[in-house]
Regions:
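Acidic Gly/Asp/Thr-rich repetitive segments characteristic of extracellular carbohydrate-active
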Residues: 67-112
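Boundary/junction segments of secreted and surface-exposed precursor proteins
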Residues: 58-70
Length: 381
């Protein structure tokens, strides 16, 4: 079949992609940085995160296993395994047409993306990748680029890894996001990807989606002169009844770079924001608001490192039932606005503390490992 090959076969027609935005290890926090809200847990030994285990080393969890909310059936349900395409024979795709065909069909698939695929998009026109249930889509090597907006709608058991998605630059037109997860989608794990300069958002989760985990990703902006650098929206309206009791999301070991707001900005869900790095870049645009509350959103903001953020803890609109943001163990450096939470958040129903690191270790760890840095589809650095 054109543009695709099974595992072990040599595929043709795809250009070898260049290395992506692998970042060097960061430095320790500078003198004068402050930590507030309690003590930070130290890195520990092996742990499980539901039936998809999250075993750890001294430098974080096993990076080939899903952790967090993606490993739960629901807010009150038990554990599940996030397997994506499972044991299906990998297919190597070298054209966007083949990637789109396999990603949107009804079979379990493991899809390895080879080369730079897609022709980009603008507004609501161009290449858009529709992903259905039981799919693993992973870049074949570090820096694999996808020039297409990604849409996961009413799909479950999806793994997306090791891809760089670059948008055309943010704008006010409410156009496609780099990644949009919606419509009863659940058990989605997004890992070691990069989302840059999304039009409306970099990676939004809305309209009844649930049990999603983001690990080791970069959500960034590199194009100056754009006014809508609003990265991660959770629910698009206070009037979104299909999201009530859903939109439970974990963000762990991610890096927000030069985002103005929505890091993330939430409604409805139980949101766990832990061990993430936030860095502002005034040359691209001011980072105004960090983790933001909205209608009926319950947030645990834990052991993160905020650098050059206007208001890292944004209590925002704490209206609706159960709206709180508890901030604990965070590190603030060159931040001017609010750094304190309000209320007591939910208790995450999954294991994570044994591989959570202190906020003082987040910068070096995340700068070294976040992004599309995996040398192969099965790499676990």
């Amino acid at each position: 079949m054109a543009g695709a090959s099974t595992a072990g076969a040599t595929s043709t027609g795809g250009a070898t992609s260049t290395a992506g935005t692998t970042s060097s290890a960061g430095t320790s926090p500078t003198a004068g940085a402050t930590t507030t809200g309690g003590t930070a847990a130290t890195a520990g030994t092996a742990a499980t995160g539901g039936s998809a285990s999250g075993g750890s080393t001294a430098s974080g969890p096993d990076q080939c296993k899903a952790i967090g909310w993606a490993t739960r059936a629901s807010r009150t349900g038990g554990t599940v395994s996030v397997t994506g395409g499972g044991d299906a024979a990998p297919i190597v795709v070298t054209t966007f047409a083949d990637l789109s065909k396999y990603a949107s069909d009804g079979q379990a698939r493991v899809i390895h993306v080879d080369g730079t695929l897609g022709n980009g998009w603008s507004g609501n026109t161009g290449d858009r990748l529709e992903i259905k249930s039981n799919k693993t889509i992973v870049g074949l090597r570090a820096g694999t680029q996808l020039k297409a907006a990604i849409h996961i709608n009413a799909a479950s058991n999806v793994i997306l890894r090791n891809l760089v998605v670059r948008g055309p630059g943010s704008n006010e037109d409410q156009a496609w996001d780099n990644l949009n997860i919606e419509g009863s989608s659940k058990n989605v794990w997004v890992d070691h990807c990069e989302f840059w300069d999304g039009q409306d958002g970099n990676a939004d989760v809305v309209k009844g989606a649930d049990t999603v985990t983001f690990t080791w990703n970069i959500f960034g902006y590199a194009l100056p002169g754009h006014s809508h650098n609003l990265s991660n929206l959770i629910a698009s309206s206070d009037s979104e009844p299909e999201s009530d009791g859903k939109l439970d999301i974990t963000y762990m070991f991610n890096w927000w770079k030069a985002a103005a707001q929505r890091q993330p900005r939430c409604r409805y869900g139980q949101i766990h924001v832990v061990n993430n790095l936030y860095t502002g870049d005034d040359a691209v645009g001011a980072s105004v608001l960090g983790v933001s509350n909205g209608f009926s959103c319950n947030v645990l903001t834990e052991n993160n490192h905020f650098i050059n953020q206007g208001q890292p803890i944004d209590l925002g609109k704490q209206d609706g039932p159960g709206s709180v943001q508890q901030a604990v163990g965070n590190l603030f450096e060159s931040c001017t606005g609010n750094q304190k939470g309000s209320g007591t958040a939910f208790t995450p129903p999954y294991e994570y503390k044994s591989f959570m690191v202190p906020a003082s270790e987040v910068q070096a760890l995340v700068k070294k490992r976040a992004g599309a840095t995996l040398a192969s589809p099965t790499a676990c650095p």
